[in-house]
Curated annotation (Swiss-Prot):
GO terms for molecular function: asparaginyl-tRNA synthase (glutamine-hydrolyzing) activity; ATP binding; glutaminyl-tRNA synthase (glutamine-hydrolyzing) activity. Heterotrimer of A, B and C subunits. This is Aspartyl/glutamyl-tRNA(Asn/Gln) amidotransferase subunit C. Pfam families: GatC (PF02686). Gene3D superfamilies: Glu-tRNAGln amidotransferase C subunit, N-terminal domain. Belongs to the GatC family. It comes from Methylobacterium radiotolerans (strain ATCC 27329 / DSM 1819 / JCM 2831 / NBRC 15690 / NCIMB 10815 / 0-1). It catalyses: L-glutamyl-tRNA(Gln) + L-glutamine + ATP + H2O = L-glutaminyl-tRNA(Gln) + L-glutamate + ADP + phosphate + H(+); L-aspartyl-tRNA(Asn) + L-glutamine + ATP + H2O = L-asparaginyl-tRNA(Asn) + L-glutamate + ADP + phosphate + 2 H(+). HAMAP family: GatC. One of its GO terms (biological process) is regulation of translational fidelity. Allows the formation of correctly charged Asn-tRNA(Asn) or Gln-tRNA(Gln) through the transamidation of misacylated Asp-tRNA(Asn) or Glu-tRNA(Gln) in organisms which lack either or both of asparaginyl-tRNA or glutaminyl-tRNA synthetases. The reaction takes place in the presence of glutamine and ATP through an activated phospho-Asp-tRNA(Asn) or phospho-Glu-tRNA(Gln). Keywords: ATP-binding, Ligase, Nucleotide-binding, Protein biosynthesis. It is an enzyme of class 6 (ligase). NCBIfam families: gatC.
Length: 95
């Protein structure tokens, strides 16, 4: 897969990043290099290799599952632009 100039500009627009005409070429090269590396990773045979979550072996830290006092609803919605009865108010998005 190859990224062209139009795709670079579209990605920049979607990411809300201002990209000058001088920056499009280098970005195109970087994106193509990243995609080539990802394609190369797809060819690696990983049959029989166990999945890993970390490069160093470690156990997940667990805490005791206890019921705690809530009562923080007012703190949770404190920075929301609009609330009602400790619920977030959002614009209607489906008719």
């Amino acid at each position: 897969m190859s990224v062209d100039e139009k795709t670079v500009r579209r990605i920049a627009h979607l990411a809300r990043i201002a990209v000058t005409d001088d920056e499009v070429g280098p970005l195109q090269g970087e994106l193509n290099a990243i995609l080539a590396f990802v394609e190369q990773l797809g060819t690696v045979d990983v049959a029989g290799v166990e999945p890993m979550t970390s490069v160093t072996p470690m156990a997940m830290k667990k805490r005791e599952d206890v019921v705690t006092e809530g009562g923080r609803a007012a703190d949770v919605v404190a920075n929301a632009p609009e609330t009602e009865d400790n619920y977030f108010l959002v614009p209607k998005v489906v008719e």
